[in-house]
Regions:
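Mid-to-C-terminal alpha-helical segments outside catalytic/metal-binding sites
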Residues: 1-12, 20-105
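Active-site flanking residues adjacent to catalytic metal/cofactor-binding acidic residues
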Residues: 17
């Protein structure tokens, strides 16, 4: 969906970690966010990572900001593209699948 965000609209995309599935980003979420959103326009990335979900689920972002600042990656960190050579080899997360092949375990 990220690849097609200009067609379907970034306001219609929500990022998810797929936890607890094996293709999820657990342990490598910052890297997965960087792989997906690094180098993308900040307004689009923020919408797909944060504000779309907050609006859909009714989250109070002002109330959550102190927690996010404590445990989450910063917008500046997410904005840094992750070179495929840096993709974690220990992860089975689809974000690091350069072939975009669906896996079956």
């Amino acid at each position: 969906e990220l690849r097609d965000r200009e067609i379907i609209g970034a306001q219609r995309v929500l990022w998810g970690s797929d936890y607890p599935h094996s293709e999820g980003s657990l342990g490598f979420t910052t890297e997965a966010l960087r792989a997906a959103f690094g180098g993308k326009p900040e307004a689009q990335a923020r919408a797909m990572i944060e504000t779309n979900a907050a609006a859909f689920f009714g989250f109070d972002l002002d109330a959550l900001r102190p927690v996010a600042d404590l445990v989450g990656p910063s917008p500046d960190e997410v904005a840094q593209p992750l070179d495929p050579a840096e993709y974690p080899t220990a992860s089975t997360c689809n974000a690091f699948d350069t072939e975009q092949v669906m896996r079956s375990w």
